[in-house]
Amino acid sequence: MPILKSYYQDVYRSPVVRLDGYSGRHALAASVLAYLDFGGATGTSKDGLAETMLAFAAERGTLTPGMPVVEASSGSFGAALAVSCATTGHPCILVVPSSLPIARRQRLQELGAKIVVSSNGSRKAMDRIAQQTAQRYNAYYTRYFSNDDNPEYHRRVTGPQILKAAGDAIDAVVIGVGSGGTVTGVAEYIKAWNSMIRIV
């Protein structure tokens, strides 16, 4: 196995696996394929996304060398962003709800993030604190839930990877929805290739 130059090198080569056992147990006529997007340092689907969002911002000049990065996230994107910031030389500040378990906070800190705790865990309240924090530290606020770089990553990476692996075999793509970035980017890419493919 070759030595990787960075942990991102394998993030962009997520495997697609045929689930023959699942299809057999449920007597399905169709094949079921699974896109396994967990090859990065945090073991989540957000590693490549976080790195790419920072790269896009740097290309535009909105993220400059050494500039702090802020996000309101206590989940997988926050963890991935902390690692991406650590590897690119950006301080990472994460706004998290007070309800977040201490162990989760400690993990984010171990990944290099500074934690700002919000007593109100609503998305609106955390976004407001993140905006204030970004202004205070002259930082770049990634705005994961509303940043167009989120679906753009999936147009450029996830959609093409799925299509390259499955090709003409795709009849439908089933996607879980969180921020909406994956389903938006993948759907737009795949529908442009074949408008008959169903997005579920």
List PLM regions with ranges:
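PLP-dependent amino-acid enzyme catalytic core
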Residues: 1-200
